[in-house]
Design a protein with these regions (language model features):
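A detector of single, family-specific signature residues
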Residues: 1-297
Length: 297
């Protein structure tokens, strides 16, 4: 570097080159790093969208309880295409009660792909005519708009998931060979952990996710029942916890391990946390060795 006040492209280029050559810790921008950053952005974006949709679904349940409370007992769930189609067209018990039977039948048949027909339409209309639901135009309008927002979010989430799947297909991670881990949850785990070479052991990943037990000691008091730290990446903690529940359902080895911990008298959440540790050890091994998970016979 010169003490003279010189600013040219050549001087700038030489300065940058000198800095890069002197820093031995700098690493090139790899495809793996790019994929991890893209996945992190996409999975966190999806997480926020799903959370937003969940709040809207709660609002739908609340509004239906006001406008047509009997409907919830007539269907498996309010959050299905046929129910949304019904409420978008007839957003209260009064609207359903006065609906033309042919129109109601056609709407239900089309939106349910033939599952619901005339008999269901009659059941809905009879229930609506005897309903104790309130006739509130403002709430009906809110219900229609809320359903529309949910449908828009569904479309956005599908688009995000398509982008996630494209990247996951390129990465071809071995953790997707674990029963119960799909590309959505797998993508979240990979994105939040990033480069597995950063971690010397599975315990470091657990600490990074906030699954390590906290330590409390003061005087003669030593915390015997330490809680999890719950620090670090909340996204990774969420992904590992939920992935573990699915894996324990679909994989016999993990199912037996969870049952063993429950038989020892541990609370369900405590037993799941033990299974999380086991899953992280498996994921760490698979990513380090690039081996596929072999399901026990």
């Amino acid at each position: 570097l010169s003490l003279r006040q010189t600013k040219t492209d050549k001087v700038d280029a030489r300065t940058i080159a000198s800095m890069l050559m002197s820093d031995v810790n700098l690493k090139s921008y790899s495809d793996t790093f790019y994929h991890n950053e893209e996945l992190k952005s996409l999975t966190r974006y999806r997480f926020d969208k799903v959370k937003e949709r969940a709040k809207l679904k709660t609002s739908v349940s609340r509004l239906v309880c006001i406008l047509f409370p009997e409907l919830e007992k007539l269907v498996p769930t309010l959050h299905m295409a046929s129910v949304y189609a019904l409420l978008s067209e007839f957003p209260s018990a009064k609207h359903v009660a006065t609906a033309h039977l042919t129109r109601l039948t056609n709407l239900l048949s089309k939106s349910s792909k033939g599952r619901y027909g005339k008999d269901t339409a009659i059941t809905f209309r009879d229930s609506a005519r005897a309903s104790i639901g309130s006739n509130m135009p403002a709430k009906s309008l809110e219900l229609k708009h809320t359903i529309k927002l949910i449908q828009e979010l569904d479309s956005e989430i599908d688009e995000i998931e398509n982008e996630i799947k494209i990247i996951m297909d390129e990465i071809n991670s071995p953790i997707l060979s674990i029963p119960g881990i799909n590309y959505r949850m797998g993508a979240m785990i990979i994105a939040e952990i990033g480069d597995f070479n950063r971690f010397d052991s599975p315990d470091k990943i657990l600490a990074y996710a906030g699954f390590s037990p906290s330590t409390y000691q003061s005087g003669q008091l030593d915390g015997a029942y330490a809680h999890m730290e719950k620090r670090g990446s909340r996204y990774l903690r969420y992904a590992l916890y939920n992935a573990t529940k699915y894996v324990c359902h679909w994989d016999p080895t993990f199912a037996a391990y969870l049952a063993k911990k429950r038989a020892e008298g541990k609370h369900y959440n405590v037993a799941i946390s033990h299974a999380v540790k086991k899953l992280v050890r498996v994921i760490y091994h698979l990513e380090k060795t690039k081996q596929q998970y072999i399901k026990a016979a």
